[in-house]
């Protein structure tokens, strides 16, 4: 078949366009630093990369959850540190009030100080992290502590001395294998419990002597005794306050275990994320040196076509 000028011209333009298209594609890959742009370019590798991307997305969710958990723990630590300081200062105030040299004015001053501590503790127990009340247990949408018309302290609507309280849980998924049973209950060891019960924090019920186990109420009862100058059984109340101060101190120290737990899983996720990102780069990334050489060769071929 005889080659006409038109056929030769069409062939030349076709080759020229093909060279330009290949050169542009390579340039695009270099700019994007990717080895392919479409799923159809490399289906097998693209599917592997999609799995890695899904894993990275999952890790990011866990990291955000751990960050929120750490924020809650930090706020909890700050708040309970304040309550711990108050309980220690309250002990010192009570000791001052029960010494033999204390007159009625000293006792009234101590009582006023203890009343102030009550208000501070109540405000602290209603501390929020973001939109959530951190001591609300499993009910974080409203302030957990309040006073009824008679001045009785309530926790989630129940009198702290006469109410019935249960263990409270609010779990977050941190990537250890969330497991939910048929009833919708989360397996305790499969997630992190960020719930902190205000009932546990301040105490509930009364002891065998009829003395309240609640720190807030205890301070009020002791203040009332100083106000009335009735110290006949003050030692029982002082001992109870010392017991509550010790309990608060133990809770404060135990925070470290939760922080260590979060740090451990944060480090594990960081390692997983690093490995996944490396794998993603291997699957999707481009060898720039090799790609630039290919681009240079394509550019030479294209320029040759223009001669």
Predicted feature locations:
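Aromatic-anchored, glycine/proline-accented short structural segments
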Residues: 180-243
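Amphipathic alpha-helical coiled-coil/heptad-repeat segments
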Residues: 91-207
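Surface-exposed beta-strand edges and their flanking turn/coil or helix-capping segments
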Residues: 18, 51, 148-150, 206-210, ...
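Amphipathic alpha-helical polymerization modules
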Residues: 1-140, 224-307
């Amino acid at each position: 078949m005889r080659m006409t000028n038109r056929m030769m011209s069409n062939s030349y333009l076709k080759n020229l366009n093909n060279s330009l298209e290949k050169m542009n594609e390579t340039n695009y890959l270099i700019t994007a630093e990717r080895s392919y742009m479409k799923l159809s370019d490399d289906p097998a590798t693209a599917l592997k990369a999609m799995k890695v991307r899904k894993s990275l997305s999952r890790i990011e969710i866990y990291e955000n959850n751990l960050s929120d958990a750490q924020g809650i723990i930090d706020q909890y630590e700050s708040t309970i540190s304040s309550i711990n300081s108050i309980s220690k200062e309250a002990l010192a105030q009570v000791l001052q009030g029960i010494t033999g040299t204390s007159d009625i004015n000293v006792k009234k001053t101590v009582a006023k100080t203890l009343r102030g501590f009550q208000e501070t503790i109540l405000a602290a127990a209603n501390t929020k992290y973001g939109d959530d009340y951190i001591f609300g247990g499993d009910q974080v949408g409203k302030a957990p502590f309040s006073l009824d018309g008679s001045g009785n302290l309530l926790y989630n609507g129940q009198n702290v001395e006469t109410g019935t309280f249960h263990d409270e849980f609010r779990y977050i998924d941190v990537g250890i294998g969330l497991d939910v049973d048929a009833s919708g209950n989360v397996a305790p060891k499969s997630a992190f419990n960020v719930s902190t019960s205000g009932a546990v924090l301040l105490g509930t019920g009364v002891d065998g002597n009829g003395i309240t186990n609640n720190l807030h109420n205890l301070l009020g009862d002791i203040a009332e005794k100083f106000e009335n100058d009735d110290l006949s059984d003050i030692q029982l109340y002082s001992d109870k306050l010392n017991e509550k101060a010790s309990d608060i101190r133990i809770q404060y120290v135990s925070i470290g275990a939760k922080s260590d737990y979060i740090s451990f899983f944060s480090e594990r996720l960081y390692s997983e994320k690093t490995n996944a990102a490396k794998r993603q780069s291997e699957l999707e990334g481009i060898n720039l040196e090799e790609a630039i050489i290919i681009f240079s060769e394509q550019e030479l071929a294209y320029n040759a076509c223009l001669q």
